[in-house]
From Swiss-Prot:
Belongs to the RNA polymerase beta chain family. Pfam families: RNA_pol_Rpb2_1, RNA_pol_Rpb2_2, RNA_pol_Rpb2_3, RNA_pol_Rpb2_45, RNA_pol_Rpb2_6, RNA_pol_Rpb2_7. This is DNA-directed RNA polymerase subunit beta. Signal peptide: none annotated. GO terms for molecular function: DNA binding; DNA-directed RNA polymerase activity; ribonucleoside binding. The lineage of its organism: Bacteria, Pseudomonadati, Pseudomonadota, Gammaproteobacteria, Enterobacterales. DNA-dependent RNA polymerase catalyzes the transcription of DNA into RNA using the four ribonucleoside triphosphates as substrates. It is an enzyme of class 2 (transferase).
Length: 1342
């Protein structure tokens, strides 16, 4: 395997056995591709903005004299970049400009001619843009639009599974779901009549919709029924026989022909009888009259002479009518063929309960259901029905819907009209009748072939279309009235409805969510999340168990492990590692093609629908070197079931063992040894890990760490290969390799790093370079580590030395005992940044003022403020300290005579304002690391704002000047090379200033041209530099666009350093979570025979019942990895020969059975071996891929190689007594995470505070500074103890006895420690509530 320069720094030993066939795809592609489709002009008009415009335009006026046509659109440039938008609280968006054409027609009697054409570009609002990392910046906060898994448009056949009716009868239904438009449902009732519902309104007999489609009774019966023809010959009734129709019936007479009896009376007709009738070619049989009576006639029989209807279709035959028909010469009678087995009389029965008898009455009936209370007119009823399913404006099945519709009805063609037609409705009714008759099956709603993914682009397009439709109405009216000659397209369009619809979607839709930015994994998982909730989806309350459950089609598409616990379980899922969506929005997963037992490298992506037709082998099936299956019988999946198949029957094979899990679950080592519930918790808790100050890669990983770190966008990744030319904490400069340079460019890439910024979860985002000067790097190499990454690998926690043993009850109930050394070494220390803002508004009484002149505040409180009233950077503040001094004018109050006198003498006006300063919230303390001031246009900037502006300008100028110098020096290197080739002395050149170099006289024409070219390049560079500085200067100095009524906003950023402490929550990666119970001194911790103490003591009882054995294997393998690292460290310290070091590390990498990883250290230079050894001395990092990890014997090999007992258990000594513990203890290294559930954020105490308005009881919760509720059960406890006075105190003065608590306060002030309980306020509330019911209660004192 070839390693790049940076990969050689630390190689992860891989225990994977299966060869890597397919690289992990870019993990954010679902977001980026979808949005790209939305904003990129699509010439076919199928997707994005183009599709939205084409579906609404052209807009015609009501009179048809004019129309507004769409030509094209373009997106403008963004005003601010991503970082500026975040700082200013702006939306990162671009203006949408659309070219429209207004065409005015001249109407003659015969034809319309074009009178005038006007074309103009029209502004249509702002479209939020996606950042490179798949997020949106909306009002300064980073948000993610989660993809939605919804029911695909099309037709679905389902049943109620016998739950609706008390008899338990299964009622079938069909539903046609369009992409937009009215739903059409068909359903059976318990009496087997078929009904139709439009948009879930009142049900109507299905015949009504058939009549509305212009079918009469006779035609309806013709469509849905087969006919029996009875002929009257010689006063006998003869049935034209179709033998198959007799199956299952009991003969009510002898079936005979030509004297031969084929079936005796009373016998059941079997397949044998039918075959006999067929063999003897019997076409007709004579039947008794009783057999025809009660049959239903399939057409109208009319007396030709009088025109009188003797019997109408769908009526039962009686003896009299039979006689009548015979008299009038009708010798052939058609009846409906029905039976109870597989030809039910459902439509015929339904026609009987239908009151309508022609098209008009059916349309009126539909109109009454859809628009109750409105008078139906012929035109209105026809329009309504036409618009429901047959108008492209109101109804759209979409290409996906049509494809699913046609597939469901087993049609060959998958394309067609996007509206419904007569045949569609009739075919659906036929299929549901077939299902009721026992032919065909109902669909599985939870099959991923019936659910599709709607991503950002598609949802944004739908919202945009809604906005356009709102505009369309207004445009139609404007086109129909007034003088069009004077109007331009600009005057027609109002952009507000469009931008409002888009803004509403991105700002407040259920699927546009505040990004979870705890760590890189939580970001990536959030972007890959798939939700069944949201607009057009399910609701938590109504979602049943089936929808939430794992379905066989989830395999390789949706992760069966990662889903939240609680009410959303199963409704919010995560995309599997290799899954992607196809053009129709269905999820597909890759498989390797297999032919006759030979596995090829060819890869096909299959959707859930396609997968059902194939036999698919698992990824861990044994294959020989040539690619053939070694076993004759192979475990495979087929139609959702697992079983053994012959190797030659197999069609496909899984690509990888981690194909079925999501990114989060693929980071858990040994999940094959964990219970599923615990793996779920492990996957979820990794997302809550807080980035630590010192990052530490996991010793035991899965090989996915690098992919997550690189794709998440938190690291700086090289765009092109080159050499590191300059590196410091805030920027990295790369000199690009010549072969990757564009023509006429300086060949320099500059990467500016993010320093100490706040994330959405108040954690700290900080990038640190991980390359050194002069290092060669390749495209895709990691240059700088972000939060929770270590040398380009995801590092969410720390490798801790753990022991599984009880320790004085401090690990009871999953508690965790931690060594003081962990705190001293800052292993779990994290930085949290909080943003506090102070807004100065213009009030009715005057403007609020930010100043340090605050009434009734002592000098000490103002000591950290500058003269503008704003805290200085670097100040250490605690709860209650003033950060920004602000005073608000208050209304004139009635003054007492004394105050009036004082006013008159001293002219004091200070009491006109009240203190409304920004203070540090309770329980928060930290250091001020940044202050930002935003001032409205036209408001004078204060001194501090100008200072900040100055500082920003200086910094930007310095940055840009440095950038310019880097580019310039690269240019002059080129020029120098040219001069050297002309034998010009470089010493002379160095004495000249740079600008003069271009004026050196050169004789050779080609070289002269080259120098001129470079001179031009230098000039362009300088111009661009000046332009950049000017743009930045304007952005900084211009006033800010603030909300109405806001004059100034001051934002203060506080950084808090939090060490780990008792009460903090910690967890491993296997769902093994707990709370720290005690930080124990190092000397008291258990230690081994070498005197090394353990860092953490965990409870061994937490393992067996939870069945997460993965943590034990991780601990053992971690111990081996660390042991090997210790040996390498020892070799480095004793300065062993490099050749010996190389041999030892090579041996370590070669350990294990038939590994796919082949590391050849002979290709490494001595320097590279030393650097590798230094990075391995803390433990050799190991990768054990999901479901393909290290085996038990391999772990033992590793332990043996490290010189450790293969049991993984060692003798420990008690730190306090020095005595041996009585048995060996499992000790090893486990990767532990500190979760974002810190005791500092949870701990809270109340003395006095605010009270609820109605009940006068203290509020609850930390945010309201509330108290602890003393509830019903707590009252019982005090009653049980007989503590009557304490109880009285709790229920009165400490709760809601208003007078009592005021008196008590006064008593305490006076030093009199007594209380007088009175009536609790809640009792008065109860009295008032009872009185509101009309019952009067009065309290009488005895």
């Amino acid at each position: 395997m070839v390693y790049s320069y940076t990969e050689k720094k630390r190689i992860r030993k891989d225990f994977g056995k299966r060869p890597k066939v397919l690289d992990i795809p870019y993990l954010l592609s679902i977001q980026l591709n979808s949005f790209k489709k939305f904003i990129q002009p699509d010439l076919s008009g199928q997707h994005g903005l183009e599709a939205a415009f084409r579906s609404v335009f052209p807009i015609r006026g009501y009179n048809g004299n004019s129309e507004l046509q769409y030509v094209s659109y373009r997106l403008g440039e963004t005003i601010f970049d991503v970082k500026e938008c975040q700082i200013r609280g702006a939306t990162y968006s671009a203006a949408l400009r659309v070219k429209l054409r207004l065409v005015i027609y001249e109407r003659d009697i015969l034809e319309a001619t074009v009178k005038d054409i006007k074309e103009q570009e029209v502004y249509m609002g702002e479209i939020p843009l996606m950042t490179n990392n798949g997020t949106f910046i909306i009002n300064g906060t980073e948000r993610v639009v989660v993809s939605q898994l919804h029911r695909s448009p099309g037709v679905f056949f389902d049943s109620d599974k016998g739950k609706t009716h008390s008899s338990g009868k299964v009622l079938y239904n069909a539903r046609i779901i369009p992409y937009r438009g009215s739903w059409l449902d068909f359903e059976f009732d318990p009496k087997d009549n078929l009904f139709v519902r439009i948009d879930r309104r009142r049900k109507l007999p299905v015949s009504i919709i058939l009549r509305a489609l212009n079918y009469n009774t006779e035609e309806i019966l013709n469509i849905f029924f087969e006919k029996n023809i009875f002929k009257i010959e010689n006063n006998k009734i003869v049935l034209e026989l179709v033998p198959e129709r007799l199956r299952g019936e009991t003969a009510s007479f002898n079936i005979k022909k030509n004297g031969i009896i084929y079936v005796e009376k009373g016998r059941r007709i079997t397949a044998k009888h039918i075959q006999e009738l067929k063999n003897n070619k019997i076409k007709s049989i004579t039947v008794p009259v009783e057999y025809i009576l009660g049959r239903i006639v399939s057409k109208n029989y009319v007396d030709k002479k009088t025109g009188e209807t003797i019997i109408s279709s769908n009526t039962e035959l009686s003896l009299e009518i039979l006689e009548k028909l015979k008299k009038l010469g009708f010798y052939s009678i058609e009846t409906l063929f029905t039976n109870d087995l597989d030809h039910g009389p459902y439509i015929s029965e339904t026609l009987r309960i239908d009151s309508s008898n022609d098209r008009m009455s059916a349309l009126i009936e539909i109109y009454r259901v859809m628009r109750p209370g409105e008078p139906p007119t012929k035109e209105a009823t026809e329009n309504l029905f036409e618009n429901l399913f047959f108008s492209e404006d109101r109804y759209d099945l979409s290409t996906v819907g049509r494809m699913k519709f046609n597939r469901s009805l087993l049609r060959e063609e998958t394309k067609g009209s996007s509206t419904l037609n007569k045949e569609d409705i009739i075919d659906v009714i036929k299929k549901i009748i077939d299902i009721r008759n026992g032919k065909g099956e109902v669909d599985d709603i939870d099959h991923l072939g019936n659910r599709r993914v709607r991503s950002v682009g598609e949802m944004a397009e739908n919202q945009f279309r809604i906005g356009l439709v709102r505009v369309e109405r207004a445009v139609k009216e404007r086109l129909s009235i007034g003088d069009l000659d004077a109007l331009m397209p600009q005057d027609m369009i109002n952009a507000k409805p469009i931008s409002a619809a888009v803004k509403e979607f991105f700002g407040s839709s259920q699927l546009s969510q505040f990004m979870d930015q705890n760590n890189p994994l939580s970001e990536i998982t959030h972007k890959r999340r798939i939700s069944a909730l949201g607009l057009g989806g399910l609701t938590r309350e109504r979602a049943g168990f089936e929808v939430r459950d794992v379905h066989p089609t989830h395999y390789g598409r949706v992760c069966p492990i990662e889903t939240p616990e609680g009410p959303n379980i199963g409704l919010i899922n995560s995309l599997s590692v290799y899954a992607q969506t196809n053009s129709h929005g269905f999820l597909e997963t890759p498989y390797r093609k297999v032919c006759n037992g030979l596995v090829s490298e060819e890869i096909h992506y299959l959707s859930a629908i396609e997968e059902g037709n194939y036999i698919i082998a698992q990824a861990n099936t044994n294959i020989d070197k040539t690619g053939f299956f070694t076993d004759d019988l192979v475990t495979c999946r087929h139609k959702g079931e697992s079983s053994l198949f012959n190797r030659n029957q197999v069609n496909y094979m899984d690509v990888s063992t981690q194909q079925i899990v999501s990114v989060g679950a693929s980071l858990i080592p040994f999940p094959e040894h964990d219970d599923a519930n615990r793996a779920l918790m492990g996957a979820n808790m990794q997302r809550q890990a807080v980035p630590t100050l010192k990052t530490d890669k996991p010793l035991i990983g899965t090989g996915m760490e690098r992919a997550v770190a690189v794709d998440s966008g938190v690291t700086a990744v090289a765009k092109r290969s080159g050499v590191v030319q300059y590196v410091d904490a805030s920027r990295i400069v790369i000199k690009v390799d010549e072969k990757e340079m564009y023509s006429r460019e300086a060949g320099i890439d500059i990467y500016n790093l993010t320093k100490y910024t706040r994330s959405n979860q108040n954690t700290c985002i900080n990038q640190q370079p991980c390359v050194n000067l002069g290092e060669k790097i390749k495209k895709g190499d990691v240059l700088a580590d972000g939060p929770s990454t270590d040398l380009g690998e995801l590092a969410l926690g720390q490798n801790m030395r753990v022991a599984f043993m009880p320790w004085n009850g401090y690990n009871f109930e999953d508690s965790i005992l931690v060594s003081e050394r962990v705190v001293q070494e800052d292993r779990f220390t994290t930085i949290h940044i909080q943003e506090l803002s102070c807004i100065s508004r213009d009030t009715k009484l005057g403007a609020e003022e930010i100043s340090s002149d605050i009434p009734n505040v002592g000098e000490a409180a103002l000591s950290k403020l500058d003269e503008s009233g704003i805290v200085y950077i670097g100040a250490e503040v605690t709860g209650g300290d003033i950060l920004v001094g602000k005073v608000t004018p208050k209304g004139e109050t009635q003054l007492t005579p004394e105050e009036k006198l004082l006013r008159a003498i001293f002219g004091e006006k200070a009491s006109d304002v009240k203190d409304s300063s920004l203070r540090v919230p309770n329980g928060v303390s930290g250091t001020v690391i940044d202050v930002q001031i935003f001032t409205r246009d036209g408001v004078k900037k204060d001194k501090r704002a100008l200072e900040i502006e100055d500082m920003q300008l200086k910094k930007i100028k310095q940055d840009l000047t440095e950038e310019f110098k880097i580019f310039e020096s690269s240019l002059f290197t080129h020029i120098k090379k040219t001069f050297i080739s002309l034998d010009i002395e470089t010493k002379q050149l160095d004495t000249l200033p740079f600008e003069k170099w271009f004026s050196v006289d050169i004789k050779q024409k080609d070289k002269k041209k080259e120098i001129e070219k470079l001179a031009k390049q230098h000039h362009e560079l300088k111009e661009e530099f000046n332009k950049k500085i000017e743009i930045k200067r304007q952005k900084i100095t211009q006033g800010d666009d603030l909300a109405p009524g806001v004059l100034k906003i001051v934002k203060v950023y506080l950084a808090v350093k939090r060490q780990i402490q008792p009460g903090d929550k910690m967890a491993g990666r296997h769902g093994n979570k707990g709370v720290i119970s005690k930080i124990n001194p190092v000397e008291d911790m258990p230690y081994d025979e070498n005197g090394i103490p353990v860092d953490i003591v965990l409870n061994p009882l937490g393992v067996p019942s939870r069945m997460n054995i993965g943590q034990i294997l991780e601990t053992h393998l971690g111990m081996a990895a660390k042991g090997i690292g210790d040996k390498i460290n020892h070799m480095l310290k004793t300065q062993e020969k490099i050749s010996n070091l190389r041999k030892f590390i090579q041996k370590a990498f070669d350990l294990g059975d038939n590994l796919r990883q082949k590391v050849n250290l002979d290709t490494f230079s001595n320097e590279e071996i030393l650097r590798l050894a230094k990075n391995l001395k803390n433990g050799i990092p190991i990768s054990t891929p999901v479901f393909d990890g290290a085996q038990e014997n391999e772990i033992k090999q590793m332990l043996k190689f490290a010189g450790l007992p293969t049991s993984g258990q060692i003798i420990l000594f008690d730190g306090r007594t020095g005595e041996k513990f009585e048995r060996p203890v499992t000790v090893g290294y486990m990767y532990m995470l500190k979760l974002n559930h810190l005791v500092d954020d949870k701990m809270h105490a109340r003395s006095t505070g605010s009270y609820s308005l109605v009940t006068q009881q203290p509020l609850g919760g930390k945010a309201q500074f509330g108290g602890q509720r003393f509830g019903e059960m707590e009252v019982w406890a005090l009653e049980a103890y007989g503590a009557s006075y304490t109880l009285q105190e709790m229920l009165t003065v400490k709760s809601d006895d208003v007078n009592g608590r005021t008196k008590m306060y006064k008593n305490i002030v006076d030093g009199n420690h007594q209380m007088e309980p009175g009536m609790p306020e809640s009792f008065n509330v109860l009295l008032k509530e009872i009185r509101s019911l009309g019952i009067n209660i009065e309290l009488e004192s005895e």
